[in-house]
Amino acid sequence: MLLPIVVLVGLPGAGKSTIGRRLARALNTELVDSDELIERATGKACGAVFSELGEPAFRELEAIHVAEALKSSGVVSLGGGSVLTESTRELLKGQDVVWIDVPVEEGIRRTANERSRPVLQAADPAEHYRNLVKVRTPLYEEVATYRLRTNNRSPQQVVAAVLHHLEID
């Protein structure tokens, strides 16, 4: 069975999709984004699907598409909350999983005005984001083989760090 070259995880706004696209280009391979698989399957934006189904049903649907994405031999980018599902965490065992770890204040800044992410909709978005950090950090720690802190790094520097981790530089 083929395994992805690398799987990217991290909070909303961490830059998984941006880094994934650039990394796939650098490796001359495909990017499979689990959020895009959901959007293709439903014909709707992920945020709309999340709002319509509610989080538990969305996570079930997401787990199906994560399993599909992990059959790729390229770069895989997972939705920020995908690690909440135990079956996804099990599937990530044995994979090279890079946690794109964005500083909390940067993540808040990047997602503050995004209406397309219902998981972040709250009376106090900054406090809600901090709560996501608290809940998800132990799960990212569980699945990640490499934690890449993006502090003050450009996307090019993050890609270079992932390539170095993969010993492809």
UniProtKB/Swiss-Prot annotation:
ATP binds at G13, A14, G15, K16, S17, T18, R117, R153. Substrate binds at D35, R59, G80, R136. One of its GO terms (molecular function) is magnesium ion binding. Its EC number is 2.7.1.71. Binds 1 Mg(2+) ion per subunit. Its cofactor is Mg(2+). Pathway: Metabolic intermediate biosynthesis; chorismate biosynthesis; chorismate from D-erythrose 4-phosphate and phosphoenolpyruvate: step 5/7. It catalyses: shikimate + ATP = 3-phosphoshikimate + ADP + H(+). Pfam families: SKI. Its main location: cytoplasm. Belongs to the shikimate kinase family. Monomer. This is Shikimate kinase. It comes from Corynebacterium glutamicum (strain ATCC 13032 / DSM 20300 / JCM 1318 / BCRC 11384 / CCUG 27702 / LMG 3730 / NBRC 12168 / NCIMB 10025 / NRRL B-2784 / 534). The gene is aroK.
